[in-house]
UniProtKB/Swiss-Prot annotation:
The name this protein goes by in its record: 3-isopropylmalate dehydratase large subunit
Enzyme class, first EC level, given as a word: lyase
Subunit structure, interactors included: Heterodimer of LeuC and LeuD.
Keyword 4Fe-4S part of the UniProt annotation: yes
Record-linked InterPro entries: Acnase/IPM_dHydase_lsu_aba_1/3 (IPR015931), Acoase/IPM_deHydtase_lsu_aba (IPR001030), Aconitase_4Fe-4S_BS (IPR018136), Aconitase_4Fe-4S_dom (IPR036008), HAcnase/IPMdehydase_lsu_prok (IPR011826), Homoacnase/IPMdehydase_lsu (IPR006251), IPM_dehydratase_rel_enz (IPR050067), IPMI_cat (IPR033941)
Entry EC number(s): 4.2.1.33
Record keywords: 4Fe-4S, Amino-acid biosynthesis, Branched-chain amino acid biosynthesis, Iron, Iron-sulfur, Leucine biosynthesis, Lyase, Metal-binding
Species whose genome carries this gene: Metallosphaera sedula (strain ATCC 51363 / DSM 5348 / JCM 9185 / NBRC 15509 / TH2)
Example GO BP: L-leucine biosynthetic process
CDD domains to which the protein is assigned, alphabetical: IPMI
Reaction equations catalysed: (2R,3S)-3-isopropylmalate = (2S)-2-isopropylmalate
Length: 415
């Protein structure tokens, strides 16, 4: 039997040959949670009187949603999780100064062919390196922490092929929005999207992480990039580690296929109040903007800050602009490259890796009637603050161009 990437990963994890629709018990390679969900996971373990961990080296904990704590309750939650980490002697703990969980997973932990579960919907981000990564609720994650296993329904595989080279201002967000605009947000329910890149170096890991991150917005069970030379090079660069690639077999059968020609994409936005309300940036041009947010686990990586820096260098922003690299590593690299200095000189507020504005938590909550252009992942009512705010999702080029002009702007139109 020839297998897709999904089938090969889940066959290994379950110890048997699997097919779409099968209900399986799979061994987990990484189990993770953050501050906002972690205390629920711990509560489940406490109520079940099962305070044990299957393998301490395979648990990853990061503080990101409430980092630094904006109120007393947040500080209390983090304090309790720190106590749990200390008592359980967990080595892979990242406090408020390290970064967003999903960025840390691809930088330090996730590998091709792994099964990763975490208590957050954007766990699909780790699919960028070819891992089957899925977000789950606190009870399922607690069970995985205790047993090292989880149950899954093997999803139907859907093949996406990326052809050609993206234009100067096109990145992973435009590919994600292109898929959402064409197929809508509920189409991929029960499916695993496997992305094949014909020219691996034309679509780097930063771009892949953005697309995989948005897989949950497509309602996909997982969104994985087929591992290739870019995968190997990224992991070697970030960790000094050589990896074996897991790839689909020739002739593997897919439910359906779709091809995107990268050189034909335009800068896109998702208009309020849905991720699949996709339009070109030029269709929405001249909409006044109150605040721009560049960052999040969707678009807070080095290439995102390079693009923003290129557009904003030597200019002054015409509206509020908040820029947040997704991890300490990304912040440090962006600082060394001069990108942070360019953004600060342009008038942006820059801070370290926190989820803050994305979930309407802190560091830039949207007010009533405000229009936000954000590189984050969701734009439904109330996501970034007020129910009366309007959030447009975009890639870093549209976000930076909009900050430069004060209204939604295609980067090709910035002088």
């Amino acid at each position: 039997m020839t297998g897709t990437l999904t089938e090969k990963i889940l066959s290994r994890a379950s110890g048997k040959t699997v097919s779409p629709g099968d209900v399986i018990e799979a061994k987990t390679d990484i189990v993770a949670f953050h501050d906002l969900t972690g205390y629920h996971v711990i509560e489940v373990m406490e109520k079940a009187n099962m305070m044990k961990i299957f393998d301490k080296t395979k648990i990853v904990v990061a503080f990101d949603h409430l980092a630094p704590p904006p109120d007393v309750r947040s500080a209390e939650i983090q304090g309790n999780i720190r106590k749990f980490v200390k008592e359980m002697r967990l080595p892979n703990f990242h406090d408020i100064n390290v970064g967003i969980l999903h960025e840390l997973l691809i930088e330090q932990y996730a590998l091709p062919g792994q099964v990763i579960v975490a208590a957050d919907s954007h766990t699909t981000t780790s699919g960028a390196v070819g891992a089957f990564a899925q977000g789950m609720g606190a009870s399922d994650v607690a069970a995985a922490v205790i047993t090292g296993k989880t149950w899954l329904v093997v999803p139907q595989p859907f093949k996406v092929t990326l052809k050609g080279n993206p234009g100067k201002w096109i990145n992973g967000k435009d590919v994600a929005l292109e898929l959402l605009g064409k197929f809508k947000a509920d189409y991929f329910n029960g499916m695993s999207i496997e992305v094949h890149v014909e020219n691996p170096k034309a679509f780097p890991m930063d771009y892949r992480a953005t697309v995989s991150n948005m897989g949950i917005e497509m309602n996909a069970d997982a969104l994985m990039f087929v591992p290739d030379v870019e995968t190997k090079d990224y992991i070697k660069t970030m960790r000094g580690k050589e990896v074996e690639l897991v790839t689909p077999d020739p002739g593997a059968k897919y439910l359906d296929e779709h091809t995107i020609e990268l050189d034909k994409l335009e800068p896109l936005v998702a208009a309020p109040y849905s991720v699949d309300n996709v339009k070109t940036a030029r269709e929405e041009s001249k909409v006044p903007v109150d605040q721009v947010y560049i960052g999040s686990c969707t678009n807070g990586r080095l290439s995102d800050f390079r693009i923003a820096s290129e557009i904003l260098k030597g200019k002054k922003v015409k509206t509020r602009c908040i820029a947040i690299p997704s991890s300490y590593t990304m912040f440090k690299q962006a600082m060394e490259m001069g990108y942070i200095e360019d953004l600060v000189n342009a008038g942006c507020v820059v801070t370290y890796g926190t989820c803050g504005p994305c979930l309407g938590g802190h560091f830039g909550v949207a007010g009533p009637g405000e229009v936000i252009v954000s590189t984050s992942s969701r734009n439904f009512r109330g996501r970034m603050g007020s129910n009366e705010a309007k959030v447009y999702l975009s890639g870093p080029s549209v976000a930076a161009a909009s900050a430069a002009t004060g209204y939604i702007t295609d980067p090709r139109d910035v002088q």
